[in-house]
């Protein structure tokens, strides 16, 4: 279970998130929704350690942790970015195996075996040697999901996973998220799309812009 207690984030004198608390149960899909400018992406960046908080604490199963300084051997949070952030000079396999080998110091054979299994699971078998420019938008997103899963996180977070996707791809993303839930993956989805949130989420947390 993930617990966030009293999270506050400021940029200079502007408070973007004020005393925010949230609990995400194991194997649950939590959607964070709200209008543009309400701080959804900033909240996700705090949860994933890309932004330092001004106040607040994070707990995983009752044990406090710091997303900014994670334990390299025990990944709690994984993230799929809105723009995927794949390395254009690396193949699909290279994108997926880079972090596990560099950060977790896992052996190349072990990492490639895991990556191959994940690619098959998400319908990307045979794409290992392609480069990002050779992939469709939906395929790039699935590679980004596989890359996050390869670090074996406890929780997988998504930043606006349906932005700029047509209805068919939105349904595909929803199915991937629901399939991962069946495999006991806890997930947090940041989205402006309430219909999508209702389709996938067990619980919806609404955030409003601070006046």
Predicted regions located by residue number:
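The feature captures the beta-strand-to-loop junction immediately N-terminal to the Walker
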Residues: 33-35
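Helix-to-loop junction immediately C-terminal to a conserved catalytic motif
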Residues: 48
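ABC ATPase NBD coupling module
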Residues: 64-78, 108, 182
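Conserved ABC ATPase signature
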Residues: 131-135, 139
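A short, proline-enriched helix->beta-strand linker immediately N-terminal to the Walker B motif
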Residues: 150-154
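Catalytic Walker B motif of ABC-type/P-loop ATPase nucleotide-binding domains
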Residues: 156-159
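Helix N-cap at the start of a conserved alpha-helix in ABC-type nucleotide-binding domains
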Residues: 167-169
């Amino acid at each position: 279970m993930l617990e966030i207690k009293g999270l506050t984030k400021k940029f200079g004198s502007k408070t973007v998130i004020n005393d925010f608390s949230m609990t995400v149960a194991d194997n649950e899909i939590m959607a964070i929704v709200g209008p543009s400018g309400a701080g959804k992406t900033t909240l996700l960046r705090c949860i994933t350690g890309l932004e330092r908080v001004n106040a607040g604490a994070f707990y995983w199963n009752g044990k406090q942790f710091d997303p900014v300084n994670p334990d390299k051997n025990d990944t709690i949070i994984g993230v799929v970015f809105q723009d995927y952030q794949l390395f254009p000079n690396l193949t699909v396999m290279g994108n997926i195996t880079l972090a596990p080998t560099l950060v977790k110091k896992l052996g190349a054979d072990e990492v490639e075996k895991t990556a191959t299994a994940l690619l098959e699971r998400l319908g990307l078998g045979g794409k290992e040697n392609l480069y990002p420019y050779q992939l469709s938008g939906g395929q790039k997103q699935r590679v980004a999901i596989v890359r996050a899963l390869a670090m074996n996180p406890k929780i997988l977070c998504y930043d606006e996973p349906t932005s700029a996707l047509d209805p068919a791809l939105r349904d595909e993303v929803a199915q991937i998220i629901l399939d991962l839930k069946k495999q006991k993956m806890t997930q947090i989805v940041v989205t402006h799309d309430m219909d999508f949130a209702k389709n996938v989420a067990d619980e919806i947390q609404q955030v409003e812009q601070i006046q």
